[in-house]
Amino acid sequence: MVGDLLGLFAAHFAHLHGLNTIVFDSLSEVGGQPQMLYPFKQINDIPAYNSISGTDLIQKLKHDIKNETEIITNHKVVDVTKQSDGFIIDNIIYARSIIIATGAGAFKPKELPLKISDEIKEKIHYFVKDPSQFKNQTIGVFGGGDSALDLALEVAKYANVKLIHRRDQFRGLESNVKKLKSLKNVEILTPYLPKKIELINNQLDISLKKMGVEQLRNVQLDQIVVAYGFRANNRFAKKWGINLEQSNIPVDPTMKTNIDGIYAAGDVVTYPGRVPLIALGFGEAQIAITSIMRNLFPEKSLTIHSTSI
């Protein structure tokens, strides 16, 4: 398994079928974006959980496989060499099959498009693991998507928030927009673009330009959280000979890529009608494991799921 939280689930489901697995993760911790980018965020699309944080979800998945699989962190898989009946991974592991579950891939944040000194950079954040670090401060949150809205709501539990977006309309859940508008310690500034940033008396002084208006507006902030999204990169797959559509991997209904023995699941994949939901990815991981079992053991009568009679 190569990749994020779906790799953990796929390893567990593979163990149920008697397969031996290894999970590789290029990061220092397994779990992908939910663990590294927004561990405190409440995830609402997991069946049987009304709401669960990224950290709690990862911990439950890790607990399921703690005695079932080997996890190798801080290891970016570079070379995959096809053999007659399997693959050699980085000259250290032989595997009969591979599942890629890297999500959006290696992610690099889109930065605030301003000239910024090193002193100011210390007050600008692209990752927030603990929003309580902003307690009793005034924090600017830049962005208009789901991540920006989620971050603004979490930070608002501890600080005053100014949510700054270049459009009047947000690209996140309307329910979150309504929540933010109802909070007295949240000010929504739209449609504004940041034009200049300075450090004055240990505070950030941001010059904002309203769309269609020449006059600038200045706001003072203690720190800034930038949620403009991330530049994804799954180009490693191309090196392995896997076809890509932009940054995604096309798969067939069995979750197989264009290479026999290599499968993919989660937000890394693309096919008509797919939506980027964690819950959907769990099902894709199960389909991939089932396909691997049928390929490796065609003579076996396969129990597809735990509720089979």
From Swiss-Prot:
Highest taxon of the source?
Bacteria
Keyword Oxidoreductase on this protein? yes
User: What reaction(s) does this enzyme catalyze?
Assistant: 2 reduced [2Fe-2S]-[ferredoxin] + NADP(+) + H(+) = 2 oxidized [2Fe-2S]-[ferredoxin] + NADPH
Q: Which InterPro entries match?
A: FAD/NAD-bd_sf (IPR036188), FAD/NAD-binding_dom (IPR023753), Fd--NADP_Rdtase_type_2 (IPR022890), Ferredoxin-NADP_redctase_2 (IPR050097)
Cofactor-binding details, from the entry? Binds 1 FAD per subunit.
Catalytic activity, EC: 1.18.1.2
The residues that cross the membrane are none
- List the cysteine pairs that form cystine: none
Tell me the SUPFAM superfamilies matching this sequence.
FAD/NAD(P)-binding domain
* A Pfam family the protein falls into: Pyr_redox_2
Self-association state and partner proteins as the record states: Homodimer.
Q: What is this protein called?
A: Ferredoxin--NADP reductase
Species source reads Lactobacillus acidophilus (strain ATCC 700396 / NCK56 / N2 / NCFM)
The lineage, from the top, is:
Bacteria, Bacillati, Bacillota, Bacilli, Lactobacillales
